[in-house]
Amino acid sequence: MQAFCAKYPDNIIHHEAVSFDRAFATMEKADVLLNLSNTLDNMVPSKIFDYFSIGKPVVNVQKIKNCPSREYFDRYPLSFTFEDFAPNNYDLKNFLHNAKNKTVNFETVSTLFKDATIEFAAATVEKVLTDIFNDK
């Protein structure tokens, strides 16, 4: 990452650890967000939903074939998955060109990822607790 930042200092900015508020504000200013997917095949990181909620184009670098995040990136209309194990630079260039200055509004993101919203989580917890306490 440092090599790319040094080579393209006006285009790529790498931030060390920052607060959530600063990270979110910085992402809102970005033209494109970059996600480096996990190498674990049993975990979907919550950060991807933060990325989607901003509505910016997201380039996802997928490191493993069975990445559990892939299905979410496939649903998000402004995403491109760059398979690190089988890259296609031409498609990435097309995506970046076509996604320039485009956004997805929050209502659309909330609809696409209804099962990742706070409301869905709260309803699920409420249902589980209701089921537990109704069994007694």
Question: What do these predicted ranges mean?
Answer:
Residues 22, 40-43, 65:
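Active-site donor-sugar recognition loop in glycosyltransferases
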Residues 83-131:
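A charged, aromatic-enriched C-terminal amphipathic alpha-helix characteristic of glycosyltransferases
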Residues 32-34, 50, 57-63:
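Short hydrophobic beta-strand element within catalytic cores of glycosyltransferases
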Residues 1-22:
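Nucleotide-activated donor-binding/catalytic signature segment of Leloir-type glycosyltransferases, i.e.
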Residues 19-30, 53:
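Short acidic alpha-helix that forms the nucleotide-activated donor recognition element
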Residues 27-42:
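Acidic donor-binding loop of glycosyltransferase active sites
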Residues 24, 46-54, 70:
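Short alpha-helical segment that forms part of, or immediately flanks, the ligand-binding pocket
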